[in-house]
UniProtKB/Swiss-Prot annotation:
Gene: flhC
Cofactor(s) listed in the protein's UniProt record: Zn(2+)
Protein's cellular compartments: Cytoplasm
Function: Functions in complex with FlhD as a master transcriptional regulator that regulates transcription of several flagellar and non-flagellar operons by binding to their promoter region. Activates expression of class 2 flagellar genes, including fliA, which is a flagellum-specific sigma factor that turns on the class 3 genes. Also regulates genes whose products function in a variety of physiological pathways.
Quaternary structure (record): Heterohexamer composed of two FlhC and four FlhD subunits. Each FlhC binds a FlhD dimer, forming a heterotrimer, and a hexamer assembles by dimerization of two heterotrimers.
InterPro entries registered for this protein in UniProt: FlhC
Organism: Paraburkholderia phymatum (strain DSM 17167 / CIP 108236 / LMG 21445 / STM815) (Burkholderia phymatum)
Protein name (record): Flagellar transcriptional regulator FlhC
Cofactor note: Binds 1 zinc ion per subunit.
NCBIfam families: PRK12722.1
Length: 219
């Protein structure tokens, strides 16, 4: 086994840091990099300040076909494929750059990211294993993620035809509940202002009768 040069080792460290900053799990690092497990654990602790989490990685391809996850995953994978095929980036560079572009797109549109880096990495592996494929939408002509043996003709993507429950998430319901007391407070404040204005007008009219009538006639 040939020994790696210092520059190659440094590049591996930088790649590991980039993946850790984006939220990669240890299984992702071990699959993509040649650094020892001990070094990657040390890097993870230095970058994140905590030990790497344990547990299994996502393993179901069905998650990527649910309506909201499908839109986000399709956006990422089309970006990844462009960087790999058109920009000639390596797999790892396309993964990190594509995921950064995905996060930037979510921030620009003020949307919460649905896809984390581990799921993005798993998505690429599902495509490499021919479990998933890109299916063209018959309305927008965009390509979205579907199972390998799903229908290819006259299929509509979730962006063009979202389900009836779209937008009715727990977060949206919580935001609506939080906004309700604020609306009540604003209404009460408006009522208070109106009451104060009426009382002020009545007080002035009592002290100086006919003042407002003269002001209106003069106007």
């Amino acid at each position: 086994m040939s020994k790696k040069s210092l520059s190659e080792d440094a590049q591996e460290v930088f790649r590991a840091i980039a993946l850790i900053e984006l939220g990669a799990r240890m299984q992702v690092l071990e699959s993509e990099l040649t650094l020892s497990r001990e070094r990657m654990i040390r890097l993870y602790r230095e970058v994140k300040g905590v030990s790497p989490p344990k547990g299994m990685l996502p393993f179901s391809a069905d998650w990527y076909t649910t309506w909201l996850a499908n839109i986000h995953a399709s956006l990422f994978y089309n970006t990844y494929r462009f960087l790999r095929d058109e920009a000639r980036c390596s797999h790892l560079d396309a993964l990190t750059k594509g995921y950064r572009l995905y996060l930037e797109h979510c921030r620009h549109n003020q949307t919460e990211p649905v896809l984390d880096l581990t799921r993005a990495w798993t998505l690429v592996r599902f495509f490499d294993a021919n479990i998933l494929q890109l299916t063209p939408c018959c309305r927008c002509s965009g390509k979205f993620i579907g199972h390998k043996h799903d229908l290819q003709h006259n299929v509509v993507c979730d962006a063009c035809q979202p389900p009836s429950r779209a937008g009715k998430t727990k977060k949206a319901a919580a935001a609506k509940r939080d906004a309700q007391p604020q609306l009540v407070e604003v209404q009460h404040a408006a009522n208070d202002v109106e009451t104060i204005a009426v009382e002020s007008l009545a007080a002035v009219e009592t002290v100086a009768p006919g003042v407002f009538e003269e002001a209106v006639l003069a106007a």
